[in-house]
Curated annotation (Swiss-Prot):
Keyword Hydrolase found: no
Function noted in UniProt: ATP-binding (A) component of a common energy-coupling factor (ECF) ABC-transporter complex. Unlike classic ABC transporters this ECF transporter provides the energy necessary to transport a number of different substrates.
Record EC number: 7.-.-.-
Annotated protein name in UniProt: Energy-coupling factor transporter ATP-binding protein EcfA2
Alphabetical list of Pfam families matching this protein: ABC_tran
Highest taxon above the source species: Bacteria
Record keyword Translocase present: yes
Residues annotated to bind ATP: G40, H41, T42, G43, S44, G45, K46, S47
UniProt-annotated location(s): Cell membrane
Length: 285
């Protein structure tokens, strides 16, 4: 299932003294099964953009074609689109409200009018998909969990709707290092094992380098760069001009290259750097 964006514009409070252009002529296509990271500094238009993808915001102009349907058309039933495109907001654990984890996750599917058997099946499957054992956690209060576990419950609640596309707005924000790694591992699993299309908003270049296939960089409501990790992260000067940076390890690799080390410039994670440096040591010995 693809999402195609054509000449998308969004203006907040148009024709008033407070008019603000949030999105300016956005064009891109997200293919079925892709893992796309969306990066940009605060105010670049990332959150506004993703809220158009399942109809939470309507465009001022332009087209958003989801699975062949232009959701900018006012005749389109947006509830059908939201079953296909799930959106997990930043700090989604603040939206947990039920007595037990099972009840919280089943809230969305229960509103679809499906059978009790199907609801139960979806809850169990979604908990498994985010790494929470059903029997262990189903009767626990979501408020007794760690921050990372709460976030997994919130993500499971969206997954239980069985979307084809999952959009995550800063999924690791506010988590400690372990919680951060756990969430990234589960997102990676959703993509690789379950074939889900993932669109992830992030400020962390390190997170993006670890798990995304493609990066879209936004600035002032426009797409500045769009390509594979290696293509985008080579544009160091362009990224720095708009207040961003490549992963710290990449700066280290650039310095080593400048000092004459024969090492690939396409190194963006610590594990990649470790392997490359070990290879240099082995060759020198």
């Amino acid at each position: 299932m693809s999402i195609k964006i054509e000449n998308l514009n969004h203006i907040y409070m148009p024709k008033t003294p407070f008019e603000k252009i949030a999105l300016n002529n956005i064009n891109c296509e997200i293919e079925d099964g892709e893992f796309v990271a969306l990066i940009g500094h605060t105010g670049s238009g990332k959150s506004t953009f993703i809220q158009h993808l399942n109809g939470l915001l309507s465009p001022t102009s332009g087209n958003i074609i989801v699975d062949g349907v232009n959701i900018a058309d006012k005749k389109v039933k947006l509830s059908d689109i939201r079953k296909k495109v799930g959106l997990v907001f930043q700090y989604p654990e603040y939206q947990l409200f039920e007595e037990t984890i099972e009840k919280d996750i089943e809230y969305g599917p229960r509103n679809l009018g499906i059978s009790e058997e199907e609801i139960s099946k979806r809850v169990k499957k979604s908990m498994e998909m985010v790494g929470l054992d059903y029997e262990t956690y189903k009767d626990k209060s979501p408020f007794d969990l760690s921050g990372g576990q709460k976030r997994r419950v919130a993500i499971a609640g969206v997954i239980a709707m069985e979307p084809k596309v999952l959009i995550l707005d800063e999924p690791t924000a506010g988590l400690d290092p372990k919680g951060r790694e756990d969430i990234l591992a589960q997102i990676r699993l959703l993509h690789k094992e379950y074939g889900m299309t993932i669109i992830m908003v992030s400020h962390s270049m390190e997170d993006v380098a670890k798990i995304a296939d493609r990066v879209i960089v936004m600035n002032s409501g426009e797409i500045v760069l769009d390509g594979k990790i290696a293509e985008v992260f080579k544009e160091v000067e362009t990224l720095e001009k708009i207040g961003l940076a490549v992963p710290q390890v990449t700066y280290l690799i650039r310095e080593l290259r400048n000092k004459g080390f024969n090492i690939s410039e396409e190194i963006f994670t610590i594990s990649q750097a470790k392997e490359a440096l070990l290879e240099i040591i082995r060759n020198n010995n």
